[in-house]
Curated annotation (Swiss-Prot):
Pfam families: HIG_1_N (PF04588). Residues 48-61 are extracellular. It comes from Homo sapiens (Human). Its main location: membrane. It is a multi-pass membrane protein. The keyword Transmembrane applies. Keywords: Membrane, Transmembrane, Transmembrane helix. PROSITE patterns: HIG1. GO terms for cellular component: membrane; mitochondrion. The chain crosses the membrane at residues 30-47, 62-84. This is HIG1 domain family member 1B. Residues 1-94 form the HIG1 domain. One of its GO terms (biological process) is mitochondrial respirasome assembly.
């Protein structure tokens, strides 16, 4: 017997997709920046596809992939540096509070 879809209500403890996205964005703000960078690179390279000249399609796609990965890795590195810096500042504040 199938459930009546009109009567289904999600549990109260579950977040909807937008709330989950906002929560994860607050926890790690550089992830959406990395995703945005990848999308911008992909959109730009698709736009430039028309004027690629004599470059082979496979080479053009490889360059697009490398540029998008560079944006993602850059965002990951910025996130790691931000986390290390914030942990360092918290530790310094705790050390100053103990003295």
């Amino acid at each position: 017997m199938s459930a009546n879809r009109r009567w289904w209500v999600p549990p109260d403890d579950e977040d909807c997709v937008s709330e989950k996205l906002l929560r994860k964005t607050r926890e790690s703000p550089l992830v959406p920046i990395g995703l945005g960078g990848c999308l911008v690179v992909a959109a730009y390279r698709i736009y430039r596809l028309r004027s690629r000249g004599s470059t082979k399609m496979s080479i053009h796609l490889i360059h697009t992939r490398v540029a998008a990965q560079a944006c993602a890795v850059g965002a990951i590195m910025l996130g790691a540096v931000y986390t290390m810096y914030s942990d360092y500042v918290k530790r310094m504040a705790q050390d100053a509070g103990e003295k």
